[in-house]
């Protein structure tokens, strides 16, 4: 049996094996023969501890003083002391038993078994069983100031509205949900991923969580959301390899690097650097940018940033789970699949790094990437073939209610497209290379034998970001047409009819519209955004992380201001901080009218309009069922 007390848990014996110090937080590692400790220190009044027991035994935790533990709406259990001068403890999630492989991917997990409970006077203890060939994980917070525990008790509607995650496409609904992702000091994807059925590290998940908690901190003013952000930053820096990379091993049992996840780490570090200027964050960022800048392919027209390290050579591609076509389109290496979204995101990330740090060593690389992007998007061979082809394939993107109205011959063509034409598309693209299709659909890549209709909205999100980062550097008619196609055909409704793993696309549609609203004043984008927010609510996805206005790529930290926050649980908001002025979109997802009550009001003078753009009074502001209002302020 391994036995310890709550007090002793937070005072590990011996010196720390390693320590990471940031501007506002510190992480220290301690190790005994059977237990690993990861201790995060924030203010003097707040600590978080990850405990990992790595041998088959019973783990006994004693509580030597009088405490009352109660279940929290925020998640987990809060322990309040009888002695008001003693610290409080928060256990956000139940202890878990896990199996991990050599790369620390999680291959199995279940809630730990409580093997015993002892109560003697003011002393109590709880025992958990760690089985053979397993580890036992426990996460616990220690607070020494009452205001922190009061924040957990006073949750508002916005605390619980739910946030969509860019990595796992899951939803975090309450504070304790963080620790389903942040495990033993590292951020994991929530899914047991195809094809090896294991939970892998995910900086994409970390970036979404960081953005979500930045927004919730701004919306609520609660200190623990800032602690969550700092803990995520520590976790990302902890995982960075000596060569500057973040490795994942998702598709193979080797440690391949997924560059989209790598650039998510860069964006997260840039968010934190923009806020704090922390030298340690900058050091990790510099190393990460240097790594990703080297991993590109030389096309005839310019450089192309790769999607993952399997694309470095044909042998690595063959070790992965995909079927692919070996082609040298545009002079690319055969193993480069010409994946659009990661190339766009990496270009945005390195350009953002230049703007933030004034380090211009990658300027020529970015210029070259812009040329290759423009070239790839402008590929338009064989219109005579692609126009009828994507008219037919477009029929498969109609929601069922529209498809049922088609004439019988058209429905037959739809079936042929689904059963045959889509399967032939990779070979057609190999003969006539093209990403942007005549009807407005944008394909994910050029050379994989896959069909990823769910990536349409990811492409739109990244192109919307790209258009803001590089105005005039590509034909925005491509983006405008693709946005209109996605909305007008009913593709968003079609997504909810697809397999569960494909429905997430609506969450990225919201992100795309958010960025488009920041760039354009068109009312239609606000209308589309309101509808998309309703769709995400109805599907249980939560709201996109950027909507609370704290995505620092879109709105630098210095420009993020306080805004009015409704207290109604029926309402969701989108905060649009544009150079031309502030906008607040409020959407009522209920089936009844709602009068807006305010959790927080500001001094800002706001003019309100309803969904038909008619002015309305801010006195007893009413929103009809399934409708929205838009406020503008300066």
Can you name each region flagged by the protein language model?
Residues 541-579:
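Glycan-recognition and catalytic regions of carbohydrate-active enzymes
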Residues 59-130, 607-612:
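Trp/Gly-enriched beta-strand surface patches
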Residues 31, 35-53, 565-605:
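Carbohydrate-binding surface patches
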Residues 161-199, 223-246, 282-306, 312-326, ...:
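Long, well-ordered core segments of solenoidal/helical folds
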Residues 248-285, 289, 332-333, 339-351, ...:
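Aromatic-rich carbohydrate-recognition surfaces in CAZymes
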Residues 132-139, 143-152, 616-634:
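C-terminal beta-strand-rich structural cap/linker in extracellular carbohydrate-active enzymes
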Residues 8, 14-85:
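Long, solvent-exposed N-terminal ectodomains/accessory regions
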Residues 207-223, 264-280, 345-360, 457-473, ...:
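Well-ordered alpha-helical scaffold segments within catalytic/enzyme domains
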